[in-house]
C-alpha cells in the first residue's frame, strides 16, 4: 500500500520546534559542506532561527565575497557598492524581543531537567506522551552527537598509532643497521689480529740436509 504524502506544518510546541530546528540546521550545513568538498562547489547558506539568530556558512572565502559575486552575476552589483551594502544589511538579524527567546530556553531547560530526573528514577510524576516523545528526540540527537565524537576520537587514535608504528619501524631499521655495522667492524678487527699473530716463515729444518 502506497504511503500518502506527509503534510508539513508548523510545529506548535516551542521546545519541540527549537529541537527540530537545531537538528535540521546541523544536517543542512553538513550536506552543504559535503557537496562543496565532493563537487568543488562554492556554496553559501544563510539561516535565521525563529528568535532571529543568524547562522551562515561560506564554503570558500567569506559571505561578503559571495554576496559581491552574486550581485555581479545577477547584474545588480556592477560598480554599485550600495547594492552590496543593502544585501549585507538584509542579512543582519531583526530586532526581536529577547523575552521570547528567554522563555523558549527556560522551557527547554525545564524539559531537559525533568527528562534527566525521569531517566534516573526521580521526579515528582510520570511524563506524558508528548514529553516522552520530545525526550526521545533529545536522546536520539545526543546519541548521534556522542557517536560522531567517538568516531572522531577513534580515528585520531588510529592515526596516532599509525604514526607511532612508523616511528618504531624507522627506529628498528636504524638499530639493525647499527648492529650490522658494529658486527662488520668486529669481524674486520678479528681478521686484522689473526693476520698479525699468525705468520708462516718459509724455513726448512736443518735435519733434512744431514746424512
UniProtKB/Swiss-Prot annotation:
Q: Which GO terms describe its biological process?
A: flower development; positive regulation of transcription by RNA polymerase II; root development; vegetative to reproductive phase transition of meristem
Task: Give the chief site where it resides.
Answer: nucleus
One Pfam family hit: SRF-TF
Q: In which tissues is it expressed?
A: Preferentially expressed in roots. In root meristem, expressed in external cells of columella, lateral root cap and atrichoblasts. In mature root, expressed in the central cylinder. Expressed in leaf vasculature, young floral meristems and nectaries.
Q: Which SUPFAM superfamilies match?
A: SRF-like
After gene disruption, what is the outcome?
Answer: Retarded root growth, and altered root meristem size and stem-cell patterning. Late flowering phenotype.
Task: Give the matching PROSITE patterns.
Answer: K_BOX, MADS_BOX_1, MADS_BOX_2
Fill in the misc note: XAANTAL is the Mayan word for 'go slower' in recognition of the retarded root growth phenotypes of xaantal mutants.
Entry protein name: Agamous-like MADS-box protein AGL12
This protein's species is Arabidopsis thaliana (Mouse-ear cress)
